[in-house]
Amino acid sequence: MNNFKKIGLSALAGSLVAFSVNAAEMSVTGGASLTMSDQGADQEGNRFTMGNSITFAASGETDGGLTVSASYELDDDVMDDYSMSFGNDTMGTISFGGSGNSSAMSAVDDMMPNAYEEAWHGVTGAKVINGFAGINMFGYTSPTVGGITFSASYLPSSEAVSVGSSTAYAVSYTPEMVEGLTVGYATQDDNSGSATTLSDDTSESTMYAKYTYGSLTVGYQSSELDSDTNSEDADSTAFGISYAVSDSLSIGYGSHTYETSGNTNAATGADQESTAVSASYTMGGMTIAGVMND
């Protein structure tokens, strides 16, 4: 309890030095989930797990009109998910955060519509081209102009995770003349691989398109992973479709294919195909959702 108080006071003191924030608002939100998983094989032990988290957040506005916010999430990993951001509708938003953050690339790694999670969710050893996000990363999101939104992220070098730094960029476009259509592209360069996955410099990219017509949404996405030594090269494609049967009930279907090309890396070097059928039903503040993967 004492350590928690010191962290909170330190963060507040830093904010007061940098900004003069008026009428900051504090909030505490929480959630809980109960999950049952079955991998279709003989299995001993309890299949049920529970997820839980509490988020402490504060926001306010500076004398210059900047909106400043900070949040800390308390969960099974204690207080490792944290973030701070500031910005406005004119300049966009600059953020800094811990392990709960996504890079500009990983934020759009799978944009396919679904009723509950991606087609590869829950698959043992799932192979996904999903960028790289680390602890203490900077991010930027621009205001939307003419349907175009730009985002970027920068992860400084870290001796514990990577020798070099990582940069990512993404852009999305929602044209006014085609209602319901969204297209996007993202790319990321890792100047050195993760200590636990990729072993050399890599470049990843993805492009996607989604179209919504009434209650129906369809999407397609293509991604690519290139490494300096060609030992970790891979390509993936994804397809998804979802349908809102009612305000409460949604159903979805998705597929994901991951293919390698001369890939010898143990973490990324196996071809994989997965499909999923999902559904979700919402009653007030409670949602019952499920997915069946193959």
Question: Which residue ranges define each predicted feature?
Answer:
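Outer-membrane beta-barrel proteins
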Residues: 1-294
